[in-house]
Amino acid sequence: MPELPEVEVTRLGIAPHIQGRAVSAINVIDGRLRWPVPKSLTKALPGQRVQAVERRGKYLLVELETGHILIHLGMTGTLRVLPSSEPLKLHDRVTLEFGKLSLRLHDPRKFGAVLWHPKTCLLYTSD
């Protein structure tokens, strides 16, 4: 299982490549992860710019204009930044497209997670 230092190294590795870029598409190749990948992702994300890439514990938070994508790497998951033209590998589960770049979740054991939390959800209310 990727431990906290590996998750931080992953954050530091992907942030310079995706921060400030607009999501052009999201492809859910196999959404059967620890929790099903929300179908709303494919409609909610395109056109939104990545504001920041943060970490809370072992979760990566990709901050967009209208919410956060929460990513957990599970037991054996990795995130890779690749050219969009690079062929998919067998265990690639979710791909975020940024024009000519792709951010791919590669998770052989399917214990990872990709979740969407819009800023309108209870997480963001200030009472």
List each language-model region with its residue ranges:
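Structured catalytic/nucleic-acid-binding cores of DNA maintenance enzymes
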Residues: 1-126
